[in-house]
Amino acid sequence: MARLESVQNAADHARCVADRIAGKPHPYTALPWFWSEQGEQRLQIAGLTNGFDRTVTRGAVESGEFSVFCYRGGQLAGIESVNRPADHAHARRLLSGGRQVTPEQAADESFDLRAAATARPA
């Protein structure tokens, strides 16, 4: 079990518990996500990025604007972004919608993450 401490996670859990108390139980399925600003840097994480067996970097680390896509068992498990808010937003849509991108697609700057994130699941 992972311990997640963020405002969003607390709010999502509160809604789930309130629904249970009101007699409308449902499983907790919210996608964990987090952000923090550290000086000039914005760090954003979507999904659970622990236990990965492969990572793919999109963007240039040297530029200070990049995302690391984390894969577990060939499936996208999460993304860690630094100063790439669009990657974070698209990854949240991908992960919460059960959509996948291959490591090759994630690494390819010409691949349209937005289109993949908004496409209907197969």
Predicted segments — roles?
Residues 1-85:
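Mid-to-C-terminal Rossmann-like scaffold of FAD/NAD(P)H-dependent oxidoreductases
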Residues 82, 90-93, 112-117:
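A general structural signal for short secondary-structure boundary/capping elements
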Residues 100-122:
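Cysteine/selenocysteine-centered motifs that mediate thiol-based redox chemistry or coordinate metal-sulfur cofactors
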